[in-house]
Amino acid sequence: MPSYIVVGGQWGDEGKGSVIAYLALKDEPEVIARGGVGTNAGHSVFINGKKYAVRQLPTGFMQTKARLLVGAGVLVDPEVFFHELEHLKDFNVRGRVGIDYRCAIIEEKHKQLDRSNHHLHEEIGTTGSGCGPANADRVMRRAKLAKDIKELEPYLTDVAAEVNDALDDGKLVLIEGTQGFGLSLYYGTYPYVTSKDTTASAIASDVGIGPTRVDDVIVVFKSFPTRVGAGPFPTEMPQEEAERLGLVEYGTVTGRRRRVGWFDFEFARYSARINGATMLALTMLDKYDGEAFGVTDYDKLPKRAKEFVEEIEERVGVPVGLIKTGPELEHVIDRRENI
């Protein structure tokens, strides 16, 4: 069975959580591993009308048959980790989750520095979760690791070994990325970026698999891209225009209002290229065309919505395999068998 990576193609908040949740339930992967930076990114999913938000654990938690893993490249905040174990107790997460023993730890001092540093908090617009300072400590080889935290002992494992063993055994592995391409430390709008790379290559490294073991890369794009905090946003629209279009959103972690823009085809093409996208997922098509809300058959999409999808495929050069037409898990058009 294959492995596939899901990453964001813009500045985060693309709707990766809803795409991952759909794949987790539809494809029934036996292992779901989270890469990415740490607790600075929140993923939200709606299940039976109830909203669940996670910052530490894999977003595919609702697939109760899956082993849930947090890769060595991910920063762990024990406070957030144990909160989410309790928050998701209805899904028996506690008995299924494993943290790589090499994960670096976010301490209270990291969060305090993140929030008090003028450059990070006021100019860059950090989430204040402590990820940047914690990653800096890791680079300086002075960060604590998960194996140093007694409370985490029951959950420690070698994630890289587990993931590769699963692939050797023919199991389906879903790998989650966080944030988005535009926030990559290397390829994003530096210095208004996160504290490490966020591309598919980095996410694979985070969980310990080599590039030849990745079968598909799904890059997620939002019909109207958004951005939280400072930094260039070439296609940004005025707040008044966003309000007129009903595009008022707030960040999962920070609660700050998101900046909204028009779809940037050139940026999307570059993002898809660097990520090595084999397929795109498009979210919030119903915001682009209200008549697309809840549609699950591509042939039944209204003309305007369908033309938008086709323009993305033509100009980005990658097929759109998944389309979200609403917030619920079932609001999906799945075209993967046809591409």
From Swiss-Prot:
Single biological process term from Gene Ontology: IMP metabolic process
GO function terms (MF aspect): adenylosuccinate synthase activity; GTP binding; magnesium ion binding
Chain positions recorded as substrate binding sites: T252, V253, T254, G255, R256, R257, R258
Residues that, per the record, bind Mg(2+): D13, G42
GO cellular component, one term: cytoplasm
CDD domains: AdSS
Enzyme class: ligase
HAMAP family hit by this protein: Adenylosucc_synth (MF_00011)
UniProt-recorded name of the protein: Adenylosuccinate synthetase
Native source species: Thermococcus kodakarensis (strain ATCC BAA-918 / JCM 12380 / KOD1)
